[in-house]
């Protein structure tokens, strides 16, 4: 996948040079380019913002540098242009899966009080991280890009690595443990030490269902329980 990020602060995306995403870039599963919108302004003072017509607080990003940067990137990247803004569709795991199927994407990070409405003509989709205020689109873009890239073939090494994670299948993840087997008097559940893979799988599914119902009842309500799920829960409750 190729991703181009249009931003006023390209240095913020150096985080992608590290950890899982950094290795994916090194191994050429992924390419992430940052484009400084300021490089495209025709303003002699390199300004990319101005006061809003009609008055009001704050500044608005001008259409010209945004549009010109999009047009330039579009010469090589034919992907959807995605703007990170409050009016967009709320990002979730389903949307991450959808976008992970694309070969190319372009992300536009806004700043100040927003962008000139005329720039929207060049935007294909708007995405919001949630109902709260951030300093700029960069803050939303980083976790969104990370979430998408984790789903790409080869990035995590195994599909099981992300299929077991919270939200992937509509449920929160089961509890995890590592050595030592006993810490401060608290022991790891015996089933995890048993080596019985089928029982471990059932325990994890039961805990995932129970935790989701307790912590995120909204997610649990959307999840369609299978007959196998019901049996796993029934058997789990019998052992309590």
UniProtKB/Swiss-Prot annotation:
Gene: trmD
Higher taxonomy: Bacteria, Bacillati, Bacillota, Clostridia, Eubacteriales
Functional description taken from the UniProt entry: Specifically methylates guanosine-37 in various tRNAs.
Gene3D superfamilies hit by this protein: 3.40.1280.10, tRNA(m1g37)methyltransferase, domain 2
Catalytic activity: guanosine(37) in tRNA + S-adenosyl-L-methionine = N(1)-methylguanosine(37) in tRNA + S-adenosyl-L-homocysteine + H(+)
Subunit structure: Homodimer.
Cellular compartments annotated: Cytoplasm
Keyword rRNA-binding among UniProt keywords: no
One Gene Ontology cellular component annotation held by this UniProt entry: cytosol
GO aspect biological process, one term: tRNA N1-guanine methylation
Organism: Clostridium botulinum (strain Loch Maree / Type A3)
HAMAP family linked to this entry: TrmD
Any GO molecular function: tRNA (guanine(37)-N1)-methyltransferase activity
Keyword set, alphabetical order: Cytoplasm, Methyltransferase, S-adenosyl-L-methionine, Transferase, tRNA processing
Family indicated by similarity: Belongs to the RNA methyltransferase TrmD family.
Top-level lineage group: Bacteria
Keyword Transferase: yes
EC number: 2.1.1.228
PANTHER family from the UniProt entry: TRNA (GUANINE-N(1)-)-METHYLTRANSFERASE
Residue numbers binding S-adenosyl-L-methionine: 110, 129-134
Record protein name field: tRNA (guanine-N(1)-)-methyltransferase
Pfam families registered for this protein in UniProt: tRNA_m1G_MT (PF01746)
First-listed, main subcellular location of the protein, grouped into a coarse class: cytoplasm
């Amino acid at each position: 996948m190729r991703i181009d990020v249009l931003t006023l602060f390209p240095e913020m995306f150096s985080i992608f040079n590290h950890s899982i995403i950094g290795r994916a870039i090194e191994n050429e599963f992924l390419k992430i380019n940052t484009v400084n919108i300021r490089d495209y302004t025709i303003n002699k003072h390199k300004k990319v913002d101005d006061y809003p017509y009609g008055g009001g607080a704050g500044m608005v990003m001008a259409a010209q540098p945004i549009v010109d940067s999009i047009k330039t990137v579009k010469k090589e990247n034919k992907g959807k242009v995605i703007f990170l803004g409050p009016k967009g569709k709320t990002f979730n795991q389903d949307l991450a899966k959808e976008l992970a199927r694309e070969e190319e994407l372009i992300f536009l990070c806004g700043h100040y009080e927003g962008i000139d409405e005329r720039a929207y003509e060049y935007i294909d989709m708007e995405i919001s991280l949630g109902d709260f205020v951030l300093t700029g689109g960069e803050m939303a873009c980083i976790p969104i890009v990370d979430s998408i890239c984790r789903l790409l073939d080869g990035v995590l090494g195994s599909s099981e690595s992300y299929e077991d994670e919270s939200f992937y299948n509509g449920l929160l993840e089961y509890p995890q443990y590592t050595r030592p087997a006993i810490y401060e008097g608290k022991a790891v559940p015996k089933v995890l030490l048993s080596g019985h893979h089928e029982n471990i799988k059932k325990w994890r599914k039961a805990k995932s269902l129970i935790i989701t119902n307790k912590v995120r009842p909204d997610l649990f309500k959307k999840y369609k329980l299978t007959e196998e799920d019901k049996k796993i829960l029934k058997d789990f409750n019998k052992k309590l």
